[in-house]
């Protein structure tokens, strides 16, 4: 596409140049792209222009600064405010995909993937954009919600491949930072709101308002709200013009624990939901409501609820053992995961391995220590992603919430902690490895190292 068309309604240029893509990140930049140099959290994109040129960018857009470089540079005042226009101008077929957004502290990934699984069973082409990457595309992401150009590029690819529906995890950061700007969602789904990300939002009110953006104006045409969450009235009020649909666990006529999950009745259907944890009842009901809003009926949807499977790293049982991996990295998620194991193994001792991320919400650390003390019989504290923080200082914050009489070990090396716990695990003990779930790296200092809870645990089981 000619750069004049990309810059339409933004800035005039006499430049004639063919462009193959837009990029905010030199790590994902491809030959023929325009590099958009913005101020980031720590550095300005200008610092990466030479690297972008080396990788084949054909032009640079710069925010309010003149910069001489080996490719054409175009100054765009208030560049960040024009990102959605740039994306819409270039990725013109992205708008052809029907979009569903899922927001909430916990459950975004599970609900998104349950919707996708149901649509797969119903032979409806779909994709998921979120924590586990972007399905049915080669694009990858390290964020729950990727940057705006990556999203539009993926939607363009979906459209070209006749993928008609995309489910997007809408994080609070993405909603605040405009990464979903210009998109229109047929549905917005709210799962729950509990403490997280207060390093960024500062207060729970700010955090709630960030999530609420999904339901304002014409961002979402329909709203599907979890009425079991104590914040549900705020989201109902925010989405009142959309005739919101509410859901809750009491939509089930009954449910009871089974060996593999739950025996449930929904409307006139009795089935086994093969997912553990009451939170997964809520997640599955959210997915059911979403797919029903797409025009499918109970006869089509409910039989497939019995075939759902958890996403990687979400209450994932390893090799039919008593060892479970979960992404739980918030107080509420840790509470849910440990409570689930307590219910699943009523006669067992429950052990948990976890830590907390560095340079992130410090207020939740003591809370998570307290929850582990109350829900588990023994605790191993270890590194999560310490980033730039002192690992022992993070552990000390968690310890402030534990009880003196608790059985607590500290093994900072996460691999050693997992191996030690598995090697000493008794026949009537269950182990939860919490915090990283599906992740395949660990961030220590400023470097990202290959690391997988799942791989380390499976290796220790051999």
What annotation goes with each model-predicted range?
Residues 64-66, 131-132, 172, 193, ...:
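Short, ordered loop/turn segments at secondary-structure junctions
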Residues 1-15, 31-34, 44-47, 243, ...:
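ATP-dependent carboxylate-amine ligase
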């Amino acid at each position: 596409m000619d750069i004049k068309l990309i810059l339409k309604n933004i800035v005039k240029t006499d430049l004639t140049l063919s462009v193959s893509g837009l990029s905010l990140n030199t790590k994902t930049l491809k030959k023929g792209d325009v590099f958009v140099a913005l101020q980031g959290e720590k550095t300005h994109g200008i610092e990466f222009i030479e690297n972008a040129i080396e990788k084949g960018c054909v032009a640079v857009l710069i925010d309010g600064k003149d910069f001489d470089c080996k490719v054409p540079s175009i100054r765009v005042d208030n560049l960040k405010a024009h990102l959605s226009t740039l994306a819409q101008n270039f990725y013109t077929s992205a708008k052809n995909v029907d979009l569903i957004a899922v927001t909430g502290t916990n459950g975004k990934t599970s609900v998104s993937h349950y919707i996708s699984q149901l649509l797969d069973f119903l032979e409806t082409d779909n994709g998921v954009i979120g924590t586990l990457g972007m399905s049915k595309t080669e694009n990858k992401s390290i964020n729950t919600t990727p940057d705006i150009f990556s999203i539009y590029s993926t939607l363009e690819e979906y459209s070209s491949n006749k993928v008609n529906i995309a489910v997007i995890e809408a994080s609070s950061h993405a909603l605040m930072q405009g990464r979903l700007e210009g998109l229109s969602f047929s549905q917005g789904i709210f799962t729950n709101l509990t403490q997280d990300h207060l390093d960024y939002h500062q207060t729970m009110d700010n955090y709630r308002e960030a999530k609420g953006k999904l339901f304002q104006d014409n961002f979402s045409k329909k709203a599907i709200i979890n009425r079991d969450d104590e914040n549900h009235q705020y989201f109902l009020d925010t989405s009142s013009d959309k005739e919101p649909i509410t859901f809750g666990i009491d939509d089930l006529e009954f449910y009871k624990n089974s060996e593999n999950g739950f025996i449930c009745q929904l409307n006139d259907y009795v089935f086994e939901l093969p997912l553990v944890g009451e939170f997964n009842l809520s997640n599955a009901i959210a997915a059911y409501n979403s797919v029903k809003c797409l025009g499918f009926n109970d006869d089509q949807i409910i039989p497939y609820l019995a075939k759902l499977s958890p996403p990687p790293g979400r209450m994932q049982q390893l090799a039919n053992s008593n060892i479970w991996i979960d992404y739980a990295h918030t107080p509420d998620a840790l509470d849910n995961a440990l409570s689930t194991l307590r219910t699943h193994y009523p006669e067992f001792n429950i052990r948990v391995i976890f830590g907390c991320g560095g340079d992130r919400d410090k207020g939740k650390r003591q809370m998570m220590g307290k929850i582990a003390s109350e829900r588990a019989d023994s605790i191993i504290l270890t590194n999560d992603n310490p980033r730039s923080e002192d690992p022992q200082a993070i552990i000390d914050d968690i310890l402030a919430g534990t009880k003196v009489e608790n059985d607590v070990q500290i093994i900072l090396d996460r691999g050693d902690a997992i191996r030690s716990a598995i090697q000493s695990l008794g026949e009537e003990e269950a182990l939860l490895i919490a915090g990283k779930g599906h992740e395949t790296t660990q961030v220590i200092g400023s470097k990202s190292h290959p690391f997988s809870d799942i791989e380390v645990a499976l290796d220790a089981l051999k």
